[in-house]
Amino acid sequence: MLWRCALQHFSFVKTLSRRGFLRNAAFSAGSVLILSNSASLGSAQANDKLNIALVGVGGRGEWFTSTIPRTENLVALCDVDETKNPDAYERLSKARRFRDFRRMLDDMGREIDAVIVATPDHTHAVASTAALHAGKPVFCEKPLTRTIHESRALRELARKQKLATSMGNQGTAAGPFRRALELIRNGALGEIKEVHIWNDSGGADRKQPPVAGGSAPEWLDWDLWLGPAAYRPYNKEWMNRHLWREFGTNQLGNWASHTANLAFMALKVQDLWLNASPSGNAPVIRVQAKHSGVNKLSFPKWEVVEWSIPAHAGFGPVTFTWHNGRAPGSRDLLEGLVGEGLDWGDKKDRKWADFAGAMIVGSKGRIHATGHNATFRLLPEDQFKDVQTGRPEQVEPSKGHEMDWLQACRGGPPAWANFDYADALNEFLMLGNVATQFESGLEYDPVAMKVRNHREADALLSCEYRKGWSL
C-alpha cells in the first residue's frame, strides 16, 4: 500500500502549452534558461508538446516509454541492445531508433527539445554532457554519475548552458517528502545530530574479473556499451553494473540516492558545496568506512560509512551513517531506532519498506522514512498523532517528478533535483564509494573537490576515459 500511495505522487498531469512558454521565454536572468539554442526553439513552434529523446530504453527506460508519451512526443529511442523493451518499439513506431546517442544528436538535433538518460551508471555522464553540449535540457536517472569529477562536470556544464536539469530520485516529488522536509526545518524534531540510512543488499565482493566470453551477440553493440570504459573482451557478466566498480556504484548509487535524499535536502547539506563561506574557510567533510574488506574491483559484502558534516546553513554538526548488507551491529541499532523488527533477507514477500530506509534522529523526535523517502512516520507516534504527514503546508507541492522537469523545460522554476542539488548529493554518496576502498578516514573539501589527506583516494575522484570519449 505504501508503494502504491507513493506512486500517486509521480503521476503525470496536463502540461503547460509550448506556445505559452514561447510567449514568456524572456524571463529574468536569475531564472533557469532552457531550450536556448535556435534549433530547439525552432522545433518548439511546431506544436504544444516537447520532443523528447530517450537514451536507454530498458530498465528504468521502460518507465519513460510508458509515461512520457502521455504528455509529450517521444521522437527518438536509443539503446545499444536491440532486445531491450521490444514492446516500446511497437507502440512508438514513429520514433527513430539509434544505437549511438552521439549519432542521434547529430542527426536529430533540430528536432529534439530535451533528453532523458536511463543508461547504466558508467555512461550517465557522457550521454548527459553530450545532450547539454547540444543545448538540450537533461533528465538523468540516479545516480547522477559514477565518479565525483563527472558529477561536478555535469553541474558546471548545466550552469554554463543555462539548461533545465533533474536527477531521477522520484521521492523528491512526494507530498509526504515535502511535508517531512518542512517538519525538520521547522524544528519539530528538535536538533538533528544523527541520520541513519540503509539497504540490506550488500555487495557482490567479486575477487576476479570475468574472462573473455566469446563474441558479443549481433543485437548488442559491445563497444558502445563499454562507452568511456577501457576496452575488454565481451562477457555478459560485465553488464551487471552492481558487480563492478568500473561500471556501477552499487547500493550507494542505487538506493542511497533515495534514502539519503530527505535528510540531505532538509538539512541543506548541499550548501557546503553551493554556498562557500565568505570568510574563505573551506568546509571539511570527514568520512570513515568500515567494511568486509577492501575490494577495488567489486564492492564489499557489507559496509558502514560515516560522514561527519560540519555546522552549516543554520544547522549544527550532524553525522550521516550508511548501513549496507549484514554489517555487524547495524540491524540491532536500526531496529532499536525504528522500534520494531526490520524484514531483511532474500525472501520475495519481505516488506519493501524495511530493506531500505532512513531514520532521522532529533532531540525531540524521529522520522522513519521508507526507501524512496516518499512516505514516513513520526516517532514516538503518540507524541505526533495530531500532525498531518501527507502534504506540504508551506513549500510548493509537486505535480510529479518528471513533470517538474518538463515544466522547467518550459520556463518554470528549476526542479528540486536539478543538477546543482543532485551534484552535491551524488558527490556526497560517491565519496562513500571512495572511502570503502581504504581503511583510513578521508577529509574532503567540497568546494575544491579534493581529498586533502589522502593522495590515492583523491585520484579516485576521477577516472580515465578511453580514446574517443570525453565530457
Which role fits each region the language model picked out?
Residues 1-16:
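N-terminal secretory signal peptides
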Residues 11-14, 20-40:
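N-terminal export signals
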Residues 35-71:
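C-terminal segment of N-terminal export signals and the immediately downstream linker at the start
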Residues 74-91:
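NAD(P)-binding Rossmann-fold cofactor-contacting core
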Residues 120-121, 125-173, 187:
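Beta-strand-loop-alpha-helix segment that lines the small-molecule cofactor/substrate pocket
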Residues 196-239, 462-464:
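Core domains of carbohydrate- and sulfate-ester-processing enzymes
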Residues 223-315, 326-329, 335:
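Rossmann-like dinucleotide-binding domain that binds NAD(P)(H)
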Residues 295-297, 308-399:
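NAD(P)-dinucleotide binding in Rossmann-like oxidoreductases
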